Regions:
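Structured, soluble extracytoplasmic/luminal domains of envelope-associated proteins
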Residues: 100-157
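N-terminal positive-inside, membrane-proximal cytosolic segments immediately preceding the first
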Residues: 1-39
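TPR-repeat structural position
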Residues: 78-79, 85, 122, 157, ...
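Short solvent-exposed coil/turn linkers within tandem alpha-helical repeat scaffolds
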Residues: 56, 96-105, 119, 133-141, ...
Length: 229
């Protein structure tokens, strides 16, 4: 027998000893263990219940209320879309506030920003637009582009051009990127950075040559080239 091996009765004694120690440990700490396990279960059930009975109904209610505000927005009634028509038909401001954490509230921030921009309230519009958050290639770049518009109106040209270029890069599409690049080019011209403006106009011509912007950007390009001489 190897000196590493135990006689059978010694092995059984060792197992019994471990079992006894385990029983003693549970006797001493069993209450704490049960409480800890129960706490985990309660938290898990609480999260499920919160999602099922609070978050889901909240999101559904927010989405339902968005329809009325969106109808006002589509009709060009910015003030009504923003402020709402009372408790039964709140506007984007109230939806964003009352249903925080839902997709509808997130989108309401974007709508609020657009309405405020149209009203000439650029600082307030900027604040609302910055509260919007999404990771996709259509709405998020469009909001980023409008942030650039707000910054231009506020005279923050350096920040504006960064916002436009970020929007163009995030979208990387014929539908959004060309307009963002042209807006950035216009700002670069205001800043006297004609070389950068020319580079962006050329990008529209070459990379987005099938878009309507590619047909009209020639005028921007000629102007920037003339001013840059």
């Amino acid at each position: 027998m190897s000196h590493h091996e135990l006689p059978e009765h010694d092995a059984l004694d060792t197992i019994d000893e471990k079992v006894l120690k385990g029983e003693l440990f549970f006797e001493r700490h069993g209450k704490k263990i049960i409480i800890a396990v129960a706490a985990v279960v309660i938290v898990a059930l609480g999260i499920f219940a919160y999602h099922r009975f609070v978050q889901v109904p909240k999101a559904e209610k927010a989405t339902a209320q968005m329809f009325v505000a969106e109808d006002s927005f589509i009709a060009g009634q910015d003030s009504l879309a923003l402020k709402g028509q009372g408790a039964g038909a709140p506007g984007f401001e109230a939806i964003a506030k009352n249903f925080s954490g839902t997709d509808a509230a997130n989108l309401a921030h974007a709508y609020s920003g657009i309405c405020l921009y149209d009203q000439g309230k650029y600082q307030e519009a900027l604040a609302e637009l910055k509260k919007f958050s999404a990771d996709e290639a259509v709405v998020a770049p469009s909001v980023q582009r409008m942030i650039g518009d707000c910054l231009v109106q506020l005279g923050k040209l350096e920040e504006a051009v960064k916002s436009y270029e970020a929007a163009a890069k995030a979208a990387s599409s014929d539908a959004i990127s060309p307009s963002c690049l042209i807006k950035a080019g216009h700002v670069y011209e205001k800043l006297g950075k004609y070389d950068k403006a020319i580079a962006l106009y050329n990008e529209v011509k070459t990379k987005y040559y099938t878009t309507p912007e590619a047909e009209t950007v020639e005028a921007d390009l000629l102007r920037a080239q003339a001013q840059g001489k």
